[in-house]
């Protein structure tokens, strides 16, 4: 006769805590295993290794050379004069969204050269 999983679960449910602990010890000895929960170490390490691949170029402030910054925003985004001015006037805000690291670094350098304060996120 075979014992079903439900029968085993019902039998364990009727046991006291001490009996369950003794049962676990018996399982560990019989099968050479431990009932300890596994650590999440390797998964956490893998998360640390992941590198950010997409960046947002944030214009923090235009600085004193606002016209140059507007020109730089137009050059980087392809926006018209009115739209680029709105982006610069609306600082802090995103100039470019989800761009590669190289493009983000170039955009940051261009905007900083024009006189803006920029941050990559």
UniProtKB/Swiss-Prot annotation:
Keyword tags: Ribonucleoprotein, Ribosomal protein
InterPro entries reported for this sequence: Ribosomal_bL12, Ribosomal_bL12_C, Ribosomal_bL12_C/ClpS-like, Ribosomal_bL12_oligo, Ribosomal_bL12_oligo_N_sf
GO MF entries: mRNA binding; structural constituent of ribosome
One Gene Ontology term from the biological process aspect of the record: translation
A GO cellular component entry from the record: cytosolic large ribosomal subunit
Coiled coil feature spans: none
Subunit structure: Homodimer. Part of the ribosomal stalk of the 50S ribosomal subunit. Forms a multimeric L10(L12)X complex, where L10 forms an elongated spine to which 2 to 4 L12 dimers bind in a sequential fashion. Binds GTP-bound translation factors.
Function: Forms part of the ribosomal stalk which helps the ribosome interact with GTP-bound translation factors. Is thus essential for accurate translation.
Family that this chain belongs to: Belongs to the bacterial ribosomal protein bL12 family.
HAMAP family from the UniProt entry: Ribosomal_bL12
Protein name per the record: Large ribosomal subunit protein bL12
Originating species: Pseudomonas syringae pv. tomato (strain ATCC BAA-871 / DC3000)
The gene coding this protein: rplL
């Amino acid at each position: 006769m075979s014992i079903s999983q439900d029968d085993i679960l019902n039998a364990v449910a009727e046991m006291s805590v001490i009996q369950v602990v003794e049962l676990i010890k018996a399982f560990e000895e019989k099968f050479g295993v431990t009932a300890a929960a596994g650590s999440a170490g390797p998964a956490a390490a893998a998360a640390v290794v992941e590198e950010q691949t997409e960046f947002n170029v944030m214009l923090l402030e235009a600085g004193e050379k606002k016209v140059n910054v507007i020109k730089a925003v137009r050059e980087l985004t392809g926006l018209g004069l009115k739209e680029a001015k709105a982006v610069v006037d609306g600082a802090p805000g995103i100039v470019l969204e989800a761009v590669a690291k190289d493009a983000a670094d170039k955009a940051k350098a261009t905007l900083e050269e024009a006189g803006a304060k920029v941050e990559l996120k």
